């Protein structure tokens, strides 16, 4: 995403300047030529399996594989210990610029042992994953990749993505290969669900060997949970366990997990073995902090961030909020309650719970919305900017229409569906902080370059609001234009 989808290469330049890598590898120089040209690589060895761009000074990868192992390699391997740096992993930038997290061997191996203890079924049958999640982020690159290594499983790389133009590849792959566990982010399930509901062959293949459905990376709207459950029962005659966990790049990544049956989205379980969790009052919410062998020692060449990462008892502070699933029984786990930095106050001083409100309204408007930005800081009411789910919109429209975001955003059936759905949602709310009074449908995709969306599909609420200030202003005009849906 940083090198092929980007237009300004801002993130990859930032990463290269921070890391000063001694070696950069690309499979082929041709697709990466512009990105490589944007970097200062005069003192960096460039290695490639193919050099279609004919860049001077490139080291062929085949030459490296001809090197004979010797004492130097043996010594390097022998020097590896628990606190040796295994990799640098950048955060996804969900709430700010990506941070360079130190990942040690202790972190990665401890986390896999923790998962093995709470998911003993992993040892009962060969593990098979079909996975698109990027390896430059901790969900795909640590959690899933290392899970396959730990359990000697099979990893099928899915070239698809949760986008209308790319989800077709995922559908083809899942029709051919039946996973035993399926990992995805909510955006991935949103893109895949309509295909599972309408393609019996896909559903049969998908559920044939499936032992568990897992989501993480963001909160899953309850309607997606219910639709997944329904298609599983329709296809197999039984419910497939659905679960989640919570963690960050700094926790390698899992810190909590729901290793028991749950019946709703949002529950992130209890601390993994060896993990201590501290719950701290934070205004009207409860902040979660964590320590354990899977927690990072800090950030690379970012001493200021490292100094702020932990509290005086060495608990890492991720800035997330939680609440008990059952206040009378902590063993029932905790529920993710949003990111503290995303919440804001209305003019009345009332806090708006952005994370909970966002997933609630997305569920209420199912199946037509893909994602949303909640707005209204220092305003009299809450508004919402939203992106359409193209497949979901088409399922509601009987006649032929132009298949573009702009045409669907102006279609009366879609607008009426949203107006009615949000109206029903509002009627169930007790206060102004969880009622949406205006909606504006966005017709341009969120920008990776502007850090508006991460490459795992999570919307950075704060940066998206800043980038779309003009759209936010339209929401709160005294007399809004016709594109704004007034509830």
Q: Model segments located where?
A:
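Conserved ATP-dependent adenylate/AMP-binding module captured primarily in the ANL superfamily
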Residues: 4-39, 66-70, 111-130, 163-180
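Conserved pre-ATP/AMP-binding loop-to-beta segment of ANL
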Residues: 46-49, 53-90, 97, 121-128
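Gly/Ser/Thr-rich phosphate-binding loop
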Residues: 63, 151, 171, 180-184, ...
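Conserved AMP-binding/adenylation subdomain of ANL enzymes
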Residues: 109-128, 135-201
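Conserved ATP-binding/catalytic segment of the ANL
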Residues: 286-346, 484
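Adenylate-forming
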Residues: 295, 329-360, 393-412, 432-433, ...
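Conserved C-terminal "lid"/linker of ANL adenylate-forming enzymes
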Residues: 344, 370-375, 380, 386, ...
């Amino acid at each position: 995403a940083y090198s092929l989808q980007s237009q300004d290469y801002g993130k990859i330049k930032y990463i290269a300047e921070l890391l000063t890598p001694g070696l950069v590898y690309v499979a082929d120089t041709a697709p990466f030529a512009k990105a490589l040209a944007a970097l200062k690589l005069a003192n960096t060895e460039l290695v490639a399996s193919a050099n279609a761009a004919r860049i001077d000074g490139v080291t062929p990868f085949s030459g490296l594989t001809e090197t004979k192992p010797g004492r130097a390699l043996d010594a390097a391997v022998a020097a590896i210990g628990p606190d040796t740096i295994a990799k640098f992993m950048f955060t996804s930038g969900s709430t700010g610029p990506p941070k360079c997290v130190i990942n040690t061997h202790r972190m990665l191996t401890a986390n896999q042992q923790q998962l093995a203890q709470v998911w003993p079924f992993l040892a009962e049958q060969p593990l098979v994953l079909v996975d698109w999640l990027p390896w430059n982020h901790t969900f795909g690159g640590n959690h899933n990749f290392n899970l396959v290594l730990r359990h000697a499983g099979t990893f099928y790389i899915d070239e698809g993505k949760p986008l209308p133009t790319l989800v077709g590849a995922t559908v083809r792959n899942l029709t051919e290969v039946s996973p035993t566990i399926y990992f995805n982010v909510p955006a991935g399930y949103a893109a895949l669900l309509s295909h599972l509901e309408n393609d019996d062959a896909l559903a049969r293949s998908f559920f044939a060997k499936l032992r568990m459905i897992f989501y993480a990376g963001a909160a899953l709207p309850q309607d997606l949970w219910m639709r997944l459950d329904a298609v599983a029962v329709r296809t197999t005659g039984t419910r497939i366990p659905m679960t989640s966990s919570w963690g960050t790049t700094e926790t390698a990544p899992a810190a909590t997990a729901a290793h028991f049956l749950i019946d709703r989205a949002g529950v992130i379980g209890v601390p993994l073995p060896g993990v201590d969790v501290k719950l701290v009052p934070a205004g009207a919410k409860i902040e979660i902090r964590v320590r354990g062998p899977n927690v990072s020692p800090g950030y690379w060449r970012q001493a200021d961030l490292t100094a702020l990462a932990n509290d005086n008892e060495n608990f890492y502070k991720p800035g997330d909020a939680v609440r008990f699933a059952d206040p009378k029984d902590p063993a029932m786990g905790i529920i993710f309650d949003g990111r503290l930095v995303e919440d804001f106050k209305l003019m009345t001083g009332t806090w708006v719970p952005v994370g909970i409100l966002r997933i609630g309204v997305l569920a209420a408007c199912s199946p037509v919305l893909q994602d949303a930005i909640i707005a209204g800081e220092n305003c009299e009411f809450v508004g919402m900017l939203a992106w359409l789910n193209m497949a979901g919109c088409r399922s509601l429209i009987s006649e032929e229409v132009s298949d573009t975001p702009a045409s669907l955003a102006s279609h009366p059936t879609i607008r009426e569906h949203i107006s009615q759905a949000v109206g029903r949602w509002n009627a169930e709310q007790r206060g102004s902080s969880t009622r949406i009074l205006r909606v504006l449908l966005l017709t341009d995709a969120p920008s990776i370059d502007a850090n508006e969306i991460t490459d795992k599909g999570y919307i950075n609420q704060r940066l998206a609001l800043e980038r779309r200030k003009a759209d936010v202003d339209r929401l709160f005009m005294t007399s809004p234009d016709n594109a704004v849906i007034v509830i």
